[in-house]
Amino acid sequence: EHATIVDLLRNDMSLVAKNITLKRYQIYEELTAHKKITGQMSSWIQGDLPTNYRSQIGDIIYKMLPAGSISGAPKPKTTALIKDIEKKPRGYYTGISGYFDGDNLDSAVLIRFLEADGSYRCGGGITHKSVLTSEYQELIQKIYVPIF
């Protein structure tokens, strides 16, 4: 699953940057919250933005959304399917939050977070090899850490 997500994100980055490289792959961390441990897998992907990226940061972000890790592939088809299946807008869910200080962008895709009204949404990735019961257990585990 992680390899698929990395490939999707490399493709997203290729829309806005050149010389895309995978700097670090499958960094595993254990996160602890309220005496519960969950595993987190991440990778670092890097590319060269255009020299005038500061004036284009909004367009750059827009071109990359929704993140391939959310939509899957092929993105135009999967986003159309999601829109047809989900009858109400996602709001902030699966968007991004972060800041741009003029040089650096630090952001995260909002897949597990609390809304101001106290509602909570959570998602997970599936592939054609996914096992429904395993995916459900992973979802429960990932919900548990931030809520409890």
Say what each PLM segment does.
Residues L15-G39:
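Metal-dependent phosphodiester-processing active-site neighborhood
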Residues E1-S14:
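A conserved active-site cap/scaffold subdomain adjacent to cofactor or substrate pockets
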Residues E1, Q26-T32, I96-Y99:
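Short, mixed-charge, low-aromatic patches
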Residues V6, Y25, R121-G123:
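Generic beta-strand/beta-sheet core signal
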Residues M13-V16, K129-V131:
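Short helix/loop capping segments that flank catalytic or ligand/cofactor-binding pockets
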Residues K36-F148:
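Conserved hydrophobic core element of enzyme catalytic domains
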